[in-house]
A protein has these predicted regions:
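Boundary/junction segments of secreted and surface-exposed precursor proteins
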Residues: 1-2, 163-173
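Active-site-adjacent structural segments surrounding the nucleophilic cysteine of cysteine proteases
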Residues: 1-53, 138-145, 160-162
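Structured segments of extracytoplasmic/periplasmic soluble domains
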Residues: 16-28, 63-67, 90-94, 185, ...
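Surface-exposed patches in mature extracellular/periplasmic domains of secreted proteins
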Residues: 28-34, 72-79, 221-222
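Active-site-adjacent substructure of cysteine-protease-like catalytic cores
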Residues: 77-133
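Noncatalytic regulatory segments and standalone regulatory/sensor domains
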Residues: 97, 121-163
């Protein structure tokens, strides 16, 4: 989802954060996949996964119990700066665990609730980068835009991703190496090997995954051309 995708309800920012987590870790959503357009993916995910009872984070944990677990929420305290430092520290301490991710809960200057999926902790610059649905311009916690918006972090909601469909080499990324392993039939876990979620492990999984990898590469190249940042 991006800024052109309308929020379905008043918890739109939480929906965005959970949908982005679903995309990032390739969680199954019936009727859509990583090649679907953002609007269709977002609306399908929200209506399919977040339409039950209980909190939305618990609904995600229940729906994807075969792939992840929700860990205990960490509630923060202190000043705005102290809370930002605490959030960074929690994420930095887990930065070596590629399957660990978190959603930050916060309030804004207007008093509204806001949720953001953390992208990664840069331990060199000591910055916590964000995937924020609220603005194109927010990059990391504590930057000028987050201060302008008055972000006040109240909690860190961690998830531990245990399995990622299509990720055969266990690095929690979908790459050409995973495609090669699928083509070589090196399948250790059918749940991981079933990249296209059709309940069958076959060549179609490798074909789908190859399309995803190519699309991701093309998108990264496009972003690099727009920002002059080289593709890693």
């Amino acid at each position: 989802p991006d800024t052109h995708t309308p929020a379905i309800d008043t918890d739109g920012c939480l929906n965005y954060a959970l949908a982005k987590m679903s995309v990032r870790y390739h969680l199954p959503v019936s009727g859509v996949d990583l090649l679907s357009d953002s609007y269709t993916y977002y609306t399908t995910f929200t209506n399919q996964i977040l339409s039950g009872s209980g909190t939305k984070m618990d609904q995600v944990a229940d729906a994807y119990s075969a792939y992840l677990t929700r860990e205990e929420t960490v509630w923060l305290s202190g000043s705005t700066e102290e809370r930002m430092e605490q959030a960074y520290t929690i994420c930095a301490e887990n930065s070596s665990n590629a399957g660990w991710c978190c959603i930050l809960q916060m309030t804004t200057a207007s008093g509204s609730d806001h949720y953001v999926l953390a992208d990664y902790a840069d331990t060199t610059q000591k910055r916590l980068y964000l995937l924020d649905s609220g603005s194109w311009y927010v990059e990391y916690l504590g930057d000028a835009k987050t201060l302008e918006k008055g972000y006040f972090v109240t909690a860190v909601h961690p998830f531990q991703i245990q399995k990622m469909a299509g990720d055969l080499d266990g690095d929690f990324q979908l790459t050409s190496a995973d495609v090669e392993l699928l083509m070589q039939n090196r399948v250790a876990d059918p749940l991981v090997a079933d990249a296209n979620f059709d309940s069958t492990v076959d060549s179609a999984d490798a074909v789908y995954l190859a399309h995803v990898v190519q699309y991701t590469h093309d998108f990264q190249m496009q972003c690099a051309m727009q920002t002059n940042v080289p593709v890693a």
